[in-house]
Regions:
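Gram-positive cell-envelope targeting signals
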Residues: 1-74
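Extended, well-structured beta-strand/loop surface patches
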Residues: 51-107, 112-276
Length: 276
């Protein structure tokens, strides 16, 4: 669909820019030193640094380690756990147990998987598609925030899941909220702040949600893709809307419904978007 193709184009664009950047750096490293060396030699100045320059020097590819700053290891013991998750936000310890996971797609659909763990400084983004069907060693600590986007399900499997340490609380909200086409509404003003499943009642589109702090400063904007023609993309689960969050539905054919999510981690909704 449009979302998948756009994600693929963005991914290819990022890869293309990275390749161009690397090529430019290589050219600069290989060409500039000899030119400067000749210039300095012609002016009578010594250029010992460039005379000793090693053209055969190789640069190791940098590999990002998302777990470089963790302060504790996950327990090797635990329960065997496997669950399929559709698109939405999931809090580790509330919606999914702590553990070391293998995340698998179906080999056809495109997914984006994001893990943000402020306490352990883990920030991970992975694409799961026909090329990358499986992502291994996904370490999810209690309190981490996991986001899934795409059509279908991602399967999360672990052999050390800490199911006995999970905790949650029922959502205090009980009433749904309708948002019509080309309508904008504010949490805390037009409807109660809280945690909702954003559902496409009819149509398809990409509503955007802007989050503000208590001073009115914009923190982030979240862009969703939902469609009533898909069993999994018709809902984005566990969308946290703190006081002042603005949801803008600018699509003329999209009707939305905010349905209170079943369970939540906390009523401190703004903390999901802030850093201590």
């Amino acid at each position: 669909n449009t979302y998948i193709e756009e994600e693929k184009r963005r991914r290819k664009s990022r890869m293309g820019k990275a390749v161009v950047f690397v090529v430019v750096i290589i050219l600069l490293v290989s060409v500039v030193p000899p030119i400067l060396s000749q210039f300095l030699s012609g002016s009578g100045q010594e250029a010992p640094f460039f005379e000793d320059y090693d053209h055969d020097y190789t640069y190791e590819d940098y590999e990002y380690d998302p777990y470089a700053y963790v302060t504790r290891e996950l327990s090797a013991d635990g329960e065997t756990y496997s669950e399929q998750l559709a698109q939405g936000n999931y809090i580790v310890g509330t919606h999914i147990p702590e553990g070391t996971y293998i995340v698998e797609g179906d080999g056809e659909s495109f997914f984006s998987l994001t893990v943000e763990d402020k306490e352990n400084s883990i920030y991970m983004y992975e694409s799961v598609d026909e090329e990358t069907v499986k992502v291994e060693d996904v370490r999810l600590y209690a309190g981490a925030e996991v986001s899934v986007s795409g059509e279908g399900y991602l399967r999360f499997s672990a052999d050390n899941a800490q199911t006995g340490q999970m905790s949650s609380q029922p959502n205090p909200l009980t009433e749904s909220v309708r948002i019509g086409a080309e309508e904008t509404m504010t949490a805390g003003g037009d409807f109660p702040a809280g945690v909702y499943d954003v559902k496409a009642v009819s149509g398809y589109g990409s509503p955007d949600i802007t989050i503000y702090d208590t001073d009115g400063t914009e923190l982030t904007t979240v862009y969703l893709w939902i469609s009533d023609s898909s069993d999994t993309e018709n809902v984005y689960r566990n969308m946290i809307l703190p006081q002042g969050a603005v949801i803008a539905n600018m699509d003329e054919a999209l009707e939305l419904e905010l349905i209170p999510s079943e369970t939540i981690a906390s009523e401190d909704y703004l903390s999901y978007y802030t850093y201590d």
